[in-house]
Amino acid sequence: MVDTLGNMRRTHTCNELSAASAGTEVVLAGWVQRRRDHGGVIFVDLRDREGITQVVFNPDREPAVHAKAHDIRNEYVICVKGKVEKRPDDMVNPKLTTGEIEVAASELAILNTAKTPPFMVEDRIDVSESIRLKHRFVDLRRPAMQKNLLARHRAGMAAREFLNSQGFLDIETPFLTRNTPEGARDYLVPSRVNPGAFYALPQSPQLFKQMLMVAGFDRYYQIVRCFRDEDLRADRQPEFTQIDLEMSFVGEEDVMAIGEGLVANVVRQVTGEAVDLPFSRMTYDQAMADYGLDKPDLRFDMKLVDITDIAAGCGFQVFSGAVKNGGIVKALNAKGCADFTRKELDDYTEFVAIYKARGLAWVKVREDGWQSPIAKFFTDDEKASMAQRLNMAVGDLVFFGADAASVVNDSLGNLRNRIGERLGLVDKNRMCFLWVTDFPFFEYDETEKRYQAKHHPFTAPHEADMEHLHTDPEAVRSRAYDLVLNGTEIGGGSIRIHNRQVQEKMFEALGLAPEDYTAKFGFLLDALDSGAPPHGGMAFGFDRLVMLLCGESSIREVIAFPKTQKAACALTDAPSPADKKQLDELFIKVTADINKE
């Protein structure tokens, strides 16, 4: 039998009382973190989202209340009335904000019991993530999780505060929209009242926010849920949140300035740290040349170096052959790492294979020259040229990649990050923001054998590059920009196309016939033909930003109820089969049995 609250109402949180509160009668409510019986006196650590307060049940003062406290167990929900007392000097707990006081209980209500939890409600737990997600309501009681979700709340409040102060309007856009199959797969929602037709859940509010600019709202924002049916990684979820914004009558610098101000306010409100403005800038071409990735981590200095010209005529067929086939050769100098073991070198070779590299050549620089299986293939002049360009010194370890540019950049760029972590070169306490600009408009899809938009087809191209549209599409740069924090993309955007004729040209360059793009995007073209202002915007990955500010490695740690790596909810067992009646109403027939292996 459990109690009711009765007339007791909480007066303070469990992190609010101090020595100055001594003598005050208070009412606290929360969960039992721990119960201890010391020679008849029962001590209970009472926990709520704010912290912990020690409650004392003394048999000499309140025998009936003390007797009732014998029934208390971990995670019981209780309400306690009592008087705040200073602890004896030898019992002060400096680890608690409330460590100078305790509450001497005079009344106790056991509001609910609790079965033994699957794991302790504390930060240091040795339990699998699957069990944590299955019992998320228990997992979320842990201080670390409560701290993360509080940080998420503060980040959202800070974003709204800043954007409101800059004249942005918070406007909602539809979740049920039309399917426009570009990029990642859409989640489809069948329409009962329109048999055979489907809505799509939005991957972003992109087209609707452009409509709002055409409608004259000037500045829009939304902290919005988006959906993508794609394979998951540590920083991806099928449903995710972004801070979305759009502005009229602007160029890149205007949008980027707003983005910097927003991020600075979020960081200050969440971490208390100031951010140096403006952020660093780097073009896409520069990022790829020096770091191999379009989201470089600038917290440590280790650049890729192109040696294609030196390798072109060398005797090592792997290098010269790659150049002959239109590829490149790059090198990465890991200073002072010549003592890496063969096992470590083999591990790195396996690592770059993830990024389609077919091998990893290396050279250790010793007092007596190069130590490497490939040393014999190079002339003294070639060695001297590489040594000078790569700043090679005794004790260095140099890695080489030779293949198509995309493979070399991807493999060595990620190897750079891995070695930086391995050597402890990454300053974990530093936040390094970077704008990457001037992305290619197109990227070639080897699978579909056609060009696709690198960002999305509504991004404006650089006007000066339009002459290359049909002769050299890869030379066309977009007016796009990504914001990178410590090697992770946290936001991206662009100036949009606001002219119908230009938009149609870009659709056609992507291989869409007029009847196709009119069917899919006719409403956008009509809007662009109805007085569309120049406009641009961006979106921030809210989950990812909060993850980085909290020092976590997965966005699942900053989302209350995340999906698993298989896009499932371990708590509710979603997705689940629908019954036949529901499917019949939707004119859907399931042809595969999901219960079969």
From Swiss-Prot:
PROSITE patterns per record: AA_TRNA_LIGASE_II
Gene3D superfamilies xrefs: Bira Bifunctional Protein, Domain 2 (3.30.930.10), GAD-like domain (3.30.1360.30), Nucleic acid-binding proteins (2.40.50.140)
Reactions listed under catalytic activity: tRNA(Asx) + L-aspartate + ATP = L-aspartyl-tRNA(Asx) + AMP + diphosphate
Top-level enzyme category: ligase
Pfam families: GAD, tRNA-synt_2, tRNA_anti-codon
Keywords from the named record: Aminoacyl-tRNA synthetase, ATP-binding, Cytoplasm, Ligase, Nucleotide-binding, Protein biosynthesis
Protein name: Aspartate--tRNA(Asp/Asn) ligase
Species whose genome carries this gene: Desulfosudis oleivorans (strain DSM 6200 / JCM 39069 / Hxd3)
